[in-house]
């Protein structure tokens, strides 16, 4: 903190000769040290003044006797002093000059807003100096020039500006002139010298001893030396460093220059000397402090006293009171640490025993400036605030746990009734405002300005509270009152944008936006939205100024885009991150092989500066010694707290892998989130407990830990798993599903609280509650469902299932609230149906999509010719808002300039990442058609999938390689690329095609078939399991290819390896039957067969094995589940068939085995186009007979002739529709929400770094893509709750970067809190999506399904023969 000094010396100061001020003046960053033999000997060290008012002296007196002075000081508690007061106090008789403290001090002073100091304090403290009037004439005589105006030096002749000269005290001018030449010769600037002139003694010390300082502190910068020297007694602190720096650099502390400067700057000369004198005692037993802890304690006002108190009280507080050494250090590491520790010793038992606070909360209160006073105030006011005002102890602790906690508590006691009754705030809002540094002033300012800001400026009370609920809230509110009209009228910002800036960057950011917005927009090409994004963070002012300075350099010299510069700057610490990127980008790219995009990804987080520096230091170690890839290192670093996560991975990776059996990929997955450090440490501690005592698997523990807040989620699972399972009937897998998201802790606690209410009072099932909770923001979604479910159902006509569908996404809360608000408008004014509104809302970012539909639907329909159904189709995806806006912008260009049809544009836009796909089509369509020979339709086909952007870019890059080097045709490349995960599939084909063909004997067509259906994961699994399945299990390569050539091929192959012996040896199936089931119904069908054969369900008990196999091949698990649950209209159909069909032919049962053989033949055929003709020969069937067989199993003649069989679930839907047991499936854009269970694995992390591919996900991380021959394992009636929570980690998470929440089959999306800009799927997203059984993959067969004719009576009879003869179908035929 900058010291407060009167520019007019008091009589006491004038007495001091020559250099005495350096030794005598009280220092603001340490206790004052009077000269030996002075009249203050023996008195407590004087600290800076407090905001606590002191009584006025009885009468003004020009001087006190020594005795009366001592008496006065005894009444004055040094611990009450608060340096924040002094920062804002103007000097007596002179204009106030703003100080320029160091960054940390500036932040502290900015956050500690203090009351204006009472005059009586100044009188008492100033007058209370020892009487030294007699020596004054000697000083005046010795320095007559000081008082003579004629003697003042005109420093402008030395290059000082008028403003700089005004900052230099008149009496210091001659000293500045005397040392100017020497200081400039040492490299100090005029600004440096002006800052040093605050403490004139430092001018001479630095001028004379600079070379010695650099020798002792070789890394010290000019700013470091000025930062120490400008403090009171700064010259003595610099001289102390010269004396002891060498020894402090050595054992036991081994401090670096930065630490030494920090101690000298903040703790002063006494702290430097105390650290030197006590270094062995502090680091040795029993204290055993680390060097960092010693620096933390010493680097504060009163650091010397705090060190001495730690030596004395640390053993007592730890042994007698149960604190940890880290907690003691935390308390001591603030101004007033000594007093806080002593008060902690005295009040900890009282606050814990009498008031029920846990020790952690007491430590939190004490660990701030003014901790002593805060503890005493909590003891006094806790009962009053809780009993009389209804606050909870946690709220009282939250208010007290900040600088100025005492004053904030007292102000809450005084103003809570007023703010609630007169201004309509809630107690929670009052607590939120008070729970920051400067809470007192913020509360008082809210009381004063709330009416003005709401009535005159149109803000809401919530917005006023948001602005006030930060450090510096008072100043921010006052600045909003002053600048809101200017920023809105003159600069075009909205009130919401002004509120966003004020609620984060505060006063300084608002003023800087006013000043720099025109410059950044006009001269640098930024948009107002980008300027607002940069400003809306702590340090927004500095970030804006740095963008103005470095944007041209970073773009022109380093090749970054303005958007990347904005991304780096739009975080807390943006200034430092930008400067570090400028410094380290060349090093990280040239020496370490990172790409600029990866460097930007690392820098674009809180703590980006530190993360970049740590990557530079640890990348070689983590890659060479620990076997990580650069991509993995980047993934870990590209989160808030990346520095700490990297250091923890370096430390714990060997332990977690060797002692706990984790893989490096799992360690990386845990570390690659905000809070990765804490999550890794918690996994090390709790993994054995959760696995042994609670029965979780290692994979489940990793799933929980691999999210933001993983530490808290693990601890909550340990605590609540028994309760939720025993008392509430959840399964461990459901508990894991809830916990495996950002905010898992809060979601689990809310489920515990609301599950009984939602089930009993609102009629939800536990599965539905779990589905809602199993997303980011699950807590808020559950609470909103409790509040809005009755309203949405009764007033708006939605069903319970629709409300659950909307809520079961990240941002569910906001989506529900928006549906409540916009449903009437969209239906009445825009003609949408409630089902369409639900479809739009039932995705991540549903709120934004609904609002955009309301805004753009008329424009898109009237001006661009879209139908409402097409608008709904585009909006009904993650990123729907951005896709709609991009369609509005690019539709004319794509149609007029590039010749696309409106339907093609809609097809491209109607996927996750539609915005980016459209933009990429605009950019690459000419290149791909002209340079690579693709047709326009082929480009559209590639783009019309999730990840279309990345697939198009990969086709541009790899098409020549795959065709020229590997012999693929362009059509084959397009076929592989035209699926979700196309990018990764193409890259895997390039890598594995030679291996699979040369080493495993597959043909090129077979590799293409696997890649075009099962994708990257299926190709890798075939490489791994083909020898095992052929040699150990007797399958042929064609059969392995048939199983792999489906969505989920990886999981199907692994399940065949696991279950083939069981099904053949224990249950009597043949290998061919197992292959038929696996190649039609996949993993889920195989597991359903095993479950039925092991534990027969009554509904299927009457079926023979051949019947079961046929049913599984016919419709997979959905068919078996549907039969178990009872098929609608089946009894009526059976009666009708019984009446109309006479004697049944005896060959029908044989037909089922034949169906299985035919389906297996087609699935295993290496050339599907020839399968139909060869099947006629193979099975001795006529063309018509084979077509009829396929009709019975839901395949059209066109599909059969082409060998392209639809997924089993699609065939089953056709069968049910053709038989009349199920209504035609409504259009997803007009009737109901697309099945949520069908996308349960994909879009969990699309909200991160959405508009640019994230370098952290460029590794091998894709899943089996959802493909043209894909399957869905959903039940035919929609997503069953049971399916929504099946944990599938072992099959799906085979790559390190898959978002852990994808292991749970659940509704899609993860836009927590309603992201403003979800959009681009990055490589990992596309990779993981490939493990999903997405029903939309059946889109190529949709038209055929709609036209599939109804069964005739013979075909109905055949179907009824396949179904059970009794039970769920209710009769026989």
Swiss-Prot record:
The protein's matches in Pfam families, at most eight in alphabetical order, are given as: TAL_effector
Q: How is it used?
A: By combining the central DNA-binding domain with the catalytic domain of the restriction endonuclease FokI, TALE-nuclease (TALEN) enzymes able to target specific dsDNA sequences can be created that enable eukaryotic genome modification. Other potential uses as transcriptional repressors, for transposon targeting, DNA methylation or histone tail modifictions are also possible.
Please list the residue ranges that the record marks as compositionally biased, kind Basic residues.
131-141
Which InterPro entries does the protein's record reference? TAL_effector_rpt, TALE
What changes when the gene is disrupted? Reduced virulence in susceptible rice; its introduction into a deletion mutant restores virulence to the bacteria in rice plants. No longer induces SWEET11 (Os8N3, XA13, AC Q6YZF3).
Transcription regulation is among the record's keywords: yes
Annotated stretches, region: Disordered:
1-68, 127-152, 1250-1286
Which residue ranges contain the repeat HEAT?
Answer: 714-760, 782-828, 850-893, 918-961, 1053-1091
Q: Where is this motif: Nuclear localization signal NLS2?
A: 1268-1271
Which residues form the Core repeat 23. repeats? 1069-1087
Q: Which Gene Ontology terms describe the biological processes this protein takes part in? A: symbiont-mediated perturbation of host programmed cell death
Where composition is biased (Low complexity), the residues are: 142-152
Q: Which GO terms describe its molecular function?
A: DNA binding
The record comments on the domains as follows: The central DNA-binding region is composed of 23.5 tandem core repeats with 1 base-specifying residue (BSR residue 13, also called the repeat variable diresidue, RVD, residues 12 and 13) each of which recognizes 1 base in the target DNA. The BSR is the only residue which contacts DNA in a sequence-specific manner.
Q: What protein name is recorded for this chain?
A: TAL effector protein PthXo1
Lineage at the top is: Bacteria, Pseudomonadati, Pseudomonadota, Gammaproteobacteria, Lysobacterales
């Amino acid at each position: 903190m900058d010291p407060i000094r009167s520019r007019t010396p008091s009589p006491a100061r004038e007495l001091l000769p020559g250099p005495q001020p350096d030794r005598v003046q009280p220092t603001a960053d340490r206790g004052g040290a009077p000269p030996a033999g002075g009249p203050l000997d023996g008195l407590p060290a004087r600290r800076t003044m407090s905001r606590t008012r002191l009584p006025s002296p009885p009468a003004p007196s020009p001087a006190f006797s020594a005795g009366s002075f001592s008496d006065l000081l005894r009444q004055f508690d040094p611990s009450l002093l608060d340096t924040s007061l002094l920062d804002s106090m103007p000097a007596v008789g002179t204009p106030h000059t703003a100080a320029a403290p160091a960054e940390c001090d500036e932040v502290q002073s900015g956050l500690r807003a203090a009351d204006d100091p009472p005059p009586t304090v100044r009188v008492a403290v100033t007058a209370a100096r020892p009487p030294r009037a007699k020596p004054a004439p000697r000083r005046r005589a010795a320095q007559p020039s000081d008082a003579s105006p004629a003697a003042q030096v005109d420093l402008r002749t030395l290059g000082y500006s008028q403003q700089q000269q005004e900052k230099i005290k008149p009496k210091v001018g001659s000293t500045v002139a005397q040392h100017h030449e020497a200081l400039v010769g040492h490299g100090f600037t005029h600004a440096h010298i002006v800052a040093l002139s605050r403490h004139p003694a430092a001018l001479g010390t630095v001028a004379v001893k600079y070379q010695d300082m650099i020798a002792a502190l070789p890394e010290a910068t000019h700013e470091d030396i000025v930062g120490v020297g400008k403090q009171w007694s700064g010259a003595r602190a610099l001289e102390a460093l010269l004396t002891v720096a060498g020894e402090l650099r050595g054992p036991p502390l081994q401090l670096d220059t930065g630490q030494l400067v920090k101690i000298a700057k903040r703790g002063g000369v006494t702290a430097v000397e105390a650290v030197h004198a006590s270094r062995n005692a502090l680091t040795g037993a029993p204290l055993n402090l680390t060097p960092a802890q010693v620096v933390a304690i010493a680097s504060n006002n009163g650091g010397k006293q705090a060190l001495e108190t730690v030596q004395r009280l640390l053993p007592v507080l730890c042994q007698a009171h149960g604190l940890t050494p880290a907690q003691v250090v935390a308390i001591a590491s603030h101004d007033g640490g000594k007093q806080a520790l002593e008060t902690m010793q005295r009040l900890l038992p009282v606050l814990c025993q009498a008031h029920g606070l846990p020790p952690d909360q007491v430590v939190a209160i004490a660990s701030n400036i003014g901790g002593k006073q805060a503890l005493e105030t909590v003891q006094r006011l806790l009962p009053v605030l809780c009993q009389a005002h209804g606050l909870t102890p946690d709220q009282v602790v939250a208010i007290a746990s900040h600088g100025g906690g005492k004053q904030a508590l007292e102000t809450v006691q005084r103003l809570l009734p007023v703010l609630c009754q007169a201004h309509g705030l809630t107690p929670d809002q009052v607590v939120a405002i008070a729970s920051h540094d400067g809470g007192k002033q913020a509360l008082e300012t809210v009381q004063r300005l709330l009416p003005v800001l709401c009535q005159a400026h149109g803000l809401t009370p919530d917005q006023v509270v948001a602005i006030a609920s930060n450090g510096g809230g008072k100043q921010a509110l006052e600045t909003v009152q002053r600048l809101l009209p200017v920023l809105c009228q003159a600069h075009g910002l909205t009130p919401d944008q002004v509120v966003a800036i004020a609620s984060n960057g505060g006063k300084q950011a608002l003023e800087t936006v006013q000043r720099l917005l025109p410059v950044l927009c006009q001269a640098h090409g930024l948009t107002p939205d980008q300027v607002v994004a940069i400003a809306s963070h702590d340090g927004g002012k500095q970030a804006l100024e740095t963008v103005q300075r470095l944007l041209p350099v970073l773009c022109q010299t380093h090749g970054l885009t303005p958007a990347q510069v904005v991304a780096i700057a739009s975080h807390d610490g943006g200034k430092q991150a930008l400067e570090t990127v400028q410094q380290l980008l060349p090093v990280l790219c040239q020496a370490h092989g990172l790409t600029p995009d990866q460097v930007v990804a690392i820098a674009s987080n809180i703590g980006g500066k530190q993360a970049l520096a740590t990557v530079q230091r640890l990348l070689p170690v983590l890659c060479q010694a620990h076997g990580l890839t650069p991509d993995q290192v980047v993934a870990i670093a590209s989160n808030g707290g990346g520095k700490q996560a990297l250091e923890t991975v370096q430390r714990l990776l060997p332990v977690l892998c060797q002692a706990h059996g984790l893989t490096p990929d799992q360690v990386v997955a845990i570390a690659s989130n905000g809070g990765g450090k804490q999550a890794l440490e918690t996994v090390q501690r709790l993994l054995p407990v959760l696995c042994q005592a609670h029965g979780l698997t290692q994979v489940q523990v990793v799933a929980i830990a691999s999210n933001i807040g993983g530490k808290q989620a693990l601890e909550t699972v340990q605590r609540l798993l028994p309760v939720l399972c025993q008392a509430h009937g959840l399964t461990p897998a459901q508990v894991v599903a809830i916990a495996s998201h950002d905010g898992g802790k809060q979601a689990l606690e809310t489920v515990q609280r609301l599950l009984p209410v939602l089930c009993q009072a609102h009629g939800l099932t536990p599965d539905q509650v779990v589905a809602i909770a199993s997303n980011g923001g699950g807590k808020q979604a559950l609470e909103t469902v409790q509040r809005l479910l009755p309203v949405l159902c009764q007033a708006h006509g939605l069903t319970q299932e629709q409300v659950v569908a909307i809520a079961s996404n990240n941002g569910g809360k906001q989506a529900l609230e928006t549906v409540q608000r916009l449903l009437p408008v969209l239906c009445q004014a825009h003609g949408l149906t409630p089902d369409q509104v639900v479809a739009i809302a039932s995705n991540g970012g549903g709120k934004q999509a609904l609002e955009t539909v309301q805004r753009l639907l008329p424009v898109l329909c009237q001006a661009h010719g879209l139908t409402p159904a097409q608008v709904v189709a585009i909006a009904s995806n993650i990123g729907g808002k951005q896709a709609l806006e991009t369609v509005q912008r690019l539709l004319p260009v794509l149609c007029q300039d590039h010749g696309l049809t409106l339907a093609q544009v809609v097809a491209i836009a109607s996927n996750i990442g539609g915005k980016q796909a459209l933009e990429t089509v605009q950019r690459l369509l000419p290149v791909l058609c002209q340079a690579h020979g693709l047709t326009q339709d082929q480009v559209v086909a590639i783009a019309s999938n999730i990840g279309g952007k990345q697939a198009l870019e990969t086709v541009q890059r790899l098409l020549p390689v795959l065709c020229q080097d590997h012999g693929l045709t362009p059509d084959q490349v397009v076929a592989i690329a035209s699926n979700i995960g196309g990018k990764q599939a193409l890259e895997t084909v390039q890598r594995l095609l030679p291996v699979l063909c040369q080493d495993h004997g597959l043909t090129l067509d077979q590799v293409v078939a696997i890649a075009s259906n099962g994708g990257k994961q299926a190709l890798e699994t075939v490489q791994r399991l083909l020898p095992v399945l052929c040699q150990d299990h007797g399958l042929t390569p064609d059969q392995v290819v048939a199983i792999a050539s489906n969505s989920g091929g990886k999981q199907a192959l692994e399940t065949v390896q696991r279950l083939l012996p069981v099904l053949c040896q224990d249950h009597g199936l043949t290998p061919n039957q197992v292959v038929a089931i696996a190649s039609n119904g996949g993993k889920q069908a195989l597991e359903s067969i095993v479950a039925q054969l092991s534990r027969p369900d009554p509904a299927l008990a009457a079926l023979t094995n051949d019947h079961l196999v046929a049913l599984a091949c016919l419709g997979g698990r959905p068919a078996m589940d549907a039969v178990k649950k009872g098929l609608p209209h089946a009894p009526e159909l059976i009666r009708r068939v019984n009446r109309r069909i006479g004697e049944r032919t005896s060959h029908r049962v044989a037909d089922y085995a034949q169906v299985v053989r035919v389906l297996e033949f087609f699935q295993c055929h290496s050339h599907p186009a020839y399968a139909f003709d060869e099947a006629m020969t193979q099975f001795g069937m006529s063309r018509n007979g084979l077509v009829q067989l396929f009709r019975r199993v839901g395949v059209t003649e066109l599909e059969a002739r082409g060998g392209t069989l639809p997924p089993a679930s699609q065939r089953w839907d056709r069968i049910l529709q053709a038989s009349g047991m199920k209504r035609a499936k409504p259009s997803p854009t007009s009737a109901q929400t697309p099945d949520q269970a069908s996308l349960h694995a994909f879009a969990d992390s699309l909200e991160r770094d959405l508009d640019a591919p994230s370098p952290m996900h460029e590794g091998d991380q894709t899943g089996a893509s959802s493909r043209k021959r894909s399957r869905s394992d959903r039940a035919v009636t929609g997503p069953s709750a049971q399916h929504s929570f099946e944990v599938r980690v072992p099959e799906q998470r085979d790559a390190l970067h898959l978002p852990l929440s994808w292991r749970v089959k659940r509704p899609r999306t993860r836009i927590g809190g309603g992201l403003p800009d979800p959009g681009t799927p990055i490589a990992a997203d596309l990779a993981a999506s490939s493990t999903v059984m997405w029903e939309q993959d059946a889109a190529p067969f949709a038209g055929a399904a709609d036209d599939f004719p109804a069964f005739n009576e013979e075909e109905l009879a055949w179907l009824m023969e396949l179904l059970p003869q009794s039970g769920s179908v209710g009769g026989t035929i």
